[in-house]
Every structure is written in structure tokens, then in C-alpha cells.
From Swiss-Prot:
Family: Belongs to the krueppel C2H2-type zinc-finger protein family.
Name listed for the protein in its UniProt record: Zinc finger protein 256
An example Gene Ontology CC term for this record: nucleus
Location of the KRAB domain: 14-96
Region (Disordered): 55-76
Induction: By GDNF/glial cell line-derived neurotrophic factor.
Gene (UniProt): ZNF256
Role played: Transcriptional repressor that plays a role in cell proliferation. Requires TRIM28 for its activity.
Pfam families cross-referenced by the UniProt entry: KRAB (PF01352), zf-C2H2 (PF00096), zf-C2H2_15 (PF23561)
Protein localization: Nucleus
UniProt GO molecular function: DNA-binding transcription factor activity, RNA polymerase II-specific; RNA polymerase II cis-regulatory region sequence-specific DNA binding; zinc ion binding
């Protein structure tokens, strides 16, 4: 029963052929030196592990337990299936001899590094390669390949490896080895002499005493688990970075890592010119241009170009959030989100703008911010040509064209394109005004409105027009003003064809056609089509005059009246008649004046049908009928 328990797991041991990867000569020619080096290291590691497991070497068609790996087979392992042609050889970079196989080259080059020749412990004969040494040793002891599971069990339970450095030393004869796989084979050669033990005895002692691995005290109940652990210990991280001290198991991994310090990015995309440190990163990037997304989610069918992205996405369906913040307990689906979140607690802002010194938590936030300095607006609306610095702003803008308003007020049914506007609107119904001006005590529903209002008292106008020098208290006023110079009126009324510079102005105008007056005064019940009109009207009840002239201290109920009044002191007359050149301080005065040239008389008397140029003239005339 114990013996069966031990041998069962071994049935799943793989051979070298199961894990080997082959290239055609055409594919092999496309690899750079670093990739060939990596392939070389990986194949040697795979060969070492399959040999330690007792699996067959390259090209072995027999079952793993029916034949051990001979030294000749190990030294003759091929790289690509198309590679072992006699015409295809590998030159030694030091002395120039041409060797037919990759592993022959490895053993040959070991002689250039001061390694010992392999010596037979019995007759002290020196041989250059371990393959020849093992062939020679068979002449002394008449060894044959072990075929019983008992022999394999004893081999696995008696091997002790030195993992502290190279070369590897056999404790039976004191012989040194350069290649790990040769060391494993030497150990197997010694254990074959002890094959008189039975499988049941091995099983009994193996169950009673768990397998222990050299200096590592970790214990295992099954051989295949122990051997896997041994493989991890064999993979010594012998390549260390001189910059940061980080170690790697292969020279290629170290080469890739060194590019972090040198900033070298040798792999460039032919489509967009973007460069990468590793060829695998370039291959993944190219899928953006080709549209290839080979990894599909079984739950929703969504496609991904990287397997890692698919694994992260699948956590949306499973609800898995394995990364937990130790500060607040919040969990995340991937580690990068946790790292970014932890910056909230530490206050770290690693991404700094080189222009203004402002720092950010996310690199994406820095990229977006830098567009303020460069003026880049990569996201353009296909309907009106307006461009935006962020994609989210373009998405919101598109709703204006399609009439989409995803945010609906439950009180009045009004739809809003932006969530912020929706929240602002809800305060109309609730009456919440939590932001108070310390100068005049006025309340505002938004802090931003309070900040803009305070500039009335301070006189601050930080936003100046580069065309005419006019300044404004908030940026939105400046943006609106710019359209005076550009003449842009992208918003057109479907009823009368009139166009407007702002969508909000169009909405207000459309109420002229619909007759809608949604804003009601709580004092007198009067309705208004615009909220600003209601606000101005309320001041007639309260007597509030928040806008004060700094010259004569006269106050006004609305800002536009103050602006008009200031022109009395400055003498400014910005509105000029194109017919006679006469200028006016108010646009309404210019409109009335232009009727003199056009002959327009829009005001009609309802009693006699007479027309007048000005409303004031009509009012005077109506007194005639009243008698």
C-alpha cells in the first residue's frame, strides 16, 4: 500500500520532448543574440529537471521508467528539430572549433573557464567530457540502465546536491561537474550499484521519513513534489545586477533588466515608432495596430491582446479582489490599483510636471495636465469639429448633438447631459445654499459660484482675452467671449434657424417657441424662462443690490447694469453703427439707432394700427387714445 502511494505520482513525470520548443532555421535566424541566449538557458534548465525526474532525454520515445537518460543522449540534445543537420554547426568564440550541437559547445567552452577535466575515481584516467567519462566508467562496473522502479526510488531518495555554487561535486568520488545534468547522471550511476534494495523497503523508509533536500529542511511526502522543489533550488540566481544588486537565473534576464538602468529600448515599432526594452513587449504592442486579440473571456466574450489583461478582467465576473490596503481595508482586483491607492495615504505624488512643478498620483493625470501647456486637444467631435484634451469631455459633448440626457430630475423630469449640472439643478428644489459670502452674506449652492462672486468684491478678473484685452471673473465667460471674435455659432434652433454660441443659450431660446417658464417666484408667483431672470426678479422683493460701483458707490441689482454704468465713468462706447460710425455704450441703444437707417418700425398701436420705431414713442402715442 505504501509502495503504491509513492509510485503513483511519478506516472505524471514529463519527458524532455514534452517541454522542448523547436524552431525552423528561418525562425532561428530571426532571433537576436539575447533571445538565443535565453533559449539556450531555458533548454538546459528543462533538460536538467527532466533528467532529475528520471524522464527521457531529447528524442527518447520510450516510457520514462523504462530507460534512464544516457550521457550520450544528454550531450546530443538538439535545439530546433531542423537544426541537427550535419551542415549546421556552432563555432566556439574563443578557439574557433566548430561543434555540431549546442550542448557540445557548452561543454567545450567550459574548458576555457579553468574547469577540471573529468576524472574516473577508479583508474584516475582523465577525460574531457562527462559523456566520455560515463562510457569509460561502465567498463569498470559493467553498469546497465536501471529499469525497475526500485532503482529509481533509491536514486531519488539518496541524491544530495550542493546548490551553493559551481561546479557541482559528487560525494561518492569527489569529482567536479560543470553542467548540472552531468552531475545528476553521475549520482544515478552510483545508485545503480545499490539496486539490491527492494521497492517495499524504500517505500517504508520514504513514508516514515519525509524527503529532505540538502541544507533545505523543507519536507515532502511524495517524490514528485520533492523533485519539483529540488528543481527550484537548482535554479540558482547567479546573475547579479551591478547597479541595484538584483539577481537573475539567466543572463538574458539580467540583460533585459540592465536596460532599466540604461534606458535602452532597442525594439522599435515600425508603425508608430514607439520603443520597448523587451521584444515580447513589442510583439504585444503590435497587436494594437493589427487588431489581434487572441485572448477571449468565456463569460462575456470580450477580447484582449494580453493574457494578463484577460486574467485581470475575469475578476470582474468572479468578484475576486486579492490585493487589500493595510491602512483602510479597501480591496482591489490587481496590484497596480493597490499601489496607486496607497499614495492617497502616503501623500506620494511621483509624477511631476517639468513646466510648472505640479505633481500627480497617476502618470495619466500628468499626461492630461501637460496638454494645458502644449495646447494639445487630440479628441475631436466629428459633428462640429470642436476638440478636447480628454476623451471623457468629448463623450459628454457628443450628448449635446444626439440630445442624450442620462441624468433626469425626479422632481420636474428635466434631463441633464452632465451629472454636475444635475446635482446643481436638484438644489433648486431643495433650496440648499451652503456656501456664504463673508462680505455680503449671499448664499450659493456651489462653492465655485461663491468664488466667482467674491471677485465682485475684490475686483479680480484673472481671465483676459488675448484679442481685445477684455478680462473676466471666470474662465467660462472668457470662452464665451472668444466666440465673438471667431464667430462660431454651432448650436442652431430647429424652429427658426437662429444659431447660438452656447448650447445653454439655445435651450433658453427654445422656450420662446414652447412657451415654457419653469422658474417660479415664491413671493408673487411670477414665472420665468431662465433661472437668472428669476434671481434678478427676486431682488425686487428683497431690495438686494450686490453690485457696487467702485467710483461713485452706486449699487445695482444685477451685474450687467453695473457694467453699463461703469461706461459712464470710462466713456467707453463699444457698440458702433456700421452706417454712420456713431458709437453707443449699450447694444440696445445701437439696435434702436439702426432702425433710423433701416426704416424699421416694430411697435404697433393696437387701437389705430400705427407703427413706431421705439417702444417709448408707442407708449406716448397710446396716451392719445386714453384721452
Amino acid at each position: 500500500m505504501a509502495a503504491a502511494e509513492l509510485t503513483a505520482p511519478a506516472q505524471g513525470i514529463v519527458t524532455f520532448e514534452d517541454v522542448a520548443v523547436y524552431f525552423s532555421w528561418k525562425e532561428w535566424g530571426l532571433l537576436d543574440e539575447a533571445q538565443k541566449c535565453l533559449y539556450h538557458d531555458v533548454m538546459l534548465e528543462n533538460l536538467t529537471l527532466t533528467t532529475s525526474l528520471g524522464g527521457s532525454g531529447a528524442g527518447d520515445e520510450e516510457a520514462p521508467y523504462q530507460q534512464s537518460t544516457s550521457p550520450q543522449r544528454v550531450s546530443q540534445v538538439r535545439i530546433p528539430k531542423a537544426l541537427p543537420s550535419p551542415q549546421k554547426t556552432n563555432p566556439c568564440e574563443i578557439c574557433g572549433p566548430v561543434l555540431r550541437q549546442i550542448l557540445h559547445l557548452v561543454e567545450h567552452q567550459g574548458t576555457h573557464h579553468g574547469q577540471k577535466l573529468y576524472t574516473d575515481g577508479a583508474c584516475r584516467k582523465q577525460l574531457q567530457f562527462t559523456a566520455y567519462l560515463h562510457q569509460h566508467q561502465k567498463q569498470h562496473v559493467g553498469q546497465k540502465h536501471f529499469r525497475s522502479n526500485g532503482g529509481r526510488d533509491m536514486f531519488l531518495s539518496s541524491c544530495t546536491f550542493e546548490v551553493s555554487g559551481k561546479p557541482f561535486t559528487c560525494k561518492e568520488v569527489g569529482k567536479d561537474f560543470l553542467v548540472r545534468s552531468r552531475f545528476l547522471q553521475q549520482q544515478a550511476a552510483h545508485t545503480r550499484k545499490k539496486s539490491n534494495r527492494t521497492k517495499s523497503a524504500v517505500a517504508f523508509h520514504s513514508v516514515k521519513n519525509h524527503y529532505n533536500w540538502g541544507e533545505c529542511v523543507k519536507a515532502f511526502s511524495y517524490k514528485h513534489v520533492r523533485v519539483q522543489h529540488q528543481g527550484d533550488l537548482i535554479r540558482e540566481r547567479s546573475y547579479m545586477c551591478s547597479e541595484c544588486g538584483k539577481s537573475f537565473s539567466t543572463s538574458c534576464s539580467l540583460s533585459d533588466h540592465l536596460r532599466v538602468h540604461t534606458s535602452e529600448k532597442p525594439y522599435t515599432c515600425g508603425e508608430c515608432g514607439k520603443s520597448y526594452r523587451q521584444s515580447s513587449s513589442l510583439i504585444t504592442h503590435r497587436r494594437i495596430h493589427t487588431g489581434v486579440r487572441p485572448h477571449q473571456c468565456d463569460e462575456c466574450g470580450k477580447l484582449f491582446n494580453r493574457k494578463y489583461d484577460l486574467l485581470i478582467h475575469q475578476r470582474v465576473h468572479t468578484g475576486e479582489r486579492p490585493y487589500k490596503c493595510s491602512e483602510c481595508g479597501k480591496s482591489f482586483s490587481h496590484s497596480s490599483s493597490l499601489i496607486t491607492h496607497q499614495r492617497i495615504h502616503t501623500g506620494m505624488r511621483p509624477y511631476e510636471c517639468s513646466e510648472c512643478g505640479k505633481s500627480f498620483i497617476h502618470s495619466s493625470s500628468l499626461i492630461t495636465h501637460q496638454r494645458v501647456h502644449t495646447g494639445t486637444r487630440p479628441y475631436m467631435c466629428s459633428e462640429c469639429g470642436k476638440s478636447f484634451s480628454q476623451s471623457c469631455h468629448l463623450i459628454k459633448h457628443r450628448r449635446l448633438h444626439i440630445g442624450e440626457g442620462p441624468y433626469e430630475c425626479s422632481e420636474c423630469g428635466k434631463l441633464f447631459t452632465y451629472r454636475s449640472r444635475f446635482f446643481q439643478h436638484q438644489r433648486v428644489h431643495t433650496g440648499v445654499r451652503s456656501h456664504e459670502c463673508h462680505e455680503c452674506g449671499k448664499l450659493f449652492s456651489r462653492k465655485f459660484d461663491l468664488i466667482v462672486h467674491e471677485r465682485v468684491h475684490t475686483g479680480e478678473r484673472p481671465y483676459e482675452c488675448s484679442e481685445c484685452g477684455k478680462s473676466f471673473t471666470c474662465k467660462s465667460y472668457l470662452i464665451s467671449h472668444w466666440k465673438v471674435h471667431t464667430g462660431a455659432r454651432p448650436y442652431e434652433c430647429g424652429e427658426c434657424g437662429k444659431s447660438f454660441t452656447h448650447s445653454s443659450t439655445l435651450l433658453q431660446h427654445q422656450r420662446v417657441h414652447t412657451g415654457e417658464r419653469p422658474y417660479e417666484c415664491n413671493e408673487c408667483g411670477k414665472f420665468f424662462s431662465q433661472s437668472s431672470s428669476l434671481i434678478r426678479h427676486r431682488r425686487s422683493h428683497t431690495g438686494e443690490r450686490p453690485y457696487e460701483c467702485s467710483e461713485c458707490w452706486k449699487s445695482f441689482s444685477n451685474h450687467s447694469s453695473l457694467v453699463k454704468h461703469r461706461r459712464v465713468h470710462t466713456g467707453e462706447r463699444p457698440y458702433e453703427c456700421s452706417e454712420c460710425g456713431k458709437s453707443f455704450s449699450q447694444s440696445s441703444n445701437l439696435t434702436n439707432h439702426q432702425r433710423i437707417h433701416s426704416g424699421e418700425r416694430p411697435y404697433e398701436c393696437s387701437d389705430c394700427g400705427k407703427f413706431f420705431t421705439f417702444n417709448s414713442n408707442l407708449l406716448k402715442h397710446q396716451n392719445v387714445h386714453k384721452g
